[in-house]
Amino acid sequence: MSYPSFHSYIRTLRSLLKRKQRWLLEESTFLADLCLAYGSIAGLSDRQKHTLFLAAHFKNLGALYLDDHCLHQGFDDHKQALKEMQGLFTESAQIAREAGLQEVAVVLEQYYLRAIPADYLARVFQVINAWVSCRQRKGWRSSMGDKEALVILRQRAEMGWSDPDIVFHFIEHLCRYSSRPELIEACSISGFETAPPASGSGMERLDPWQSGPWSLSAALESDSY
């Protein structure tokens, strides 16, 4: 019997997420793609990008052990949210650790806290995840706008919840290389510079809405991983 390919392995993880809640799949797929795109911009090694890519999928696997009501409602109080969702964070990291993915587990144990993680990859993942979490719909709300998401990222940096260097480097490239009018306007209003993307730069991958709404089916068919 032949061993499954990495492509098949990822599709299995995505199938599990989809069967639980479709938005979990959408979020992990978008997050994984963005981790690869920003990882290249930030000069991460292939191993580091691979770790972030896997973390994007494993971060939601813990949801398989949550009651559905936890995935369908928001929480006004952050402490209550952490308490209700702790099972997701704990189980996701444990699944990764038991799979032998120690570096992935470290990222998943640190990224969700309102503090700058000690691990560098966790710091990178935390920032990308914060953007994705804002821009993707949840089980209990629609996606936030670009301006709202930029404000939240800036606030995280100012309050010491996320690494300021990574936050502003991410925003800089997000704003500079997007050609989507809505994001350009949000960046300008928020005081970030914008510029047309260099031909063939690949930087436009940071904004999956560049050519209209993000296509889940296209992302699922991508062999970029």
Kindly label every feature range from the protein language model.
Residues 31, 35-39, 92, 96, ...:
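Buried hydrophobic packing segments
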Residues 63, 132-133:
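Active-site micro-motifs of SAM-dependent methyltransferase domains
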Residues 52-56, 93-127, 132, 141-212:
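Histidine/acidic-rich helix-loop-helix segments that form or flank divalent-metal centers
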Residues 69-71, 136-140:
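Juxtamembrane interface at the ends
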Residues 1-87, 224-225:
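Acidic/His-rich, divalent-metal-binding segments that scaffold phosphate/diphosphate chemistry
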Residues 77-80, 138-146:
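Short, charged, surface-exposed loops that flank catalytic or proteolytic processing sites
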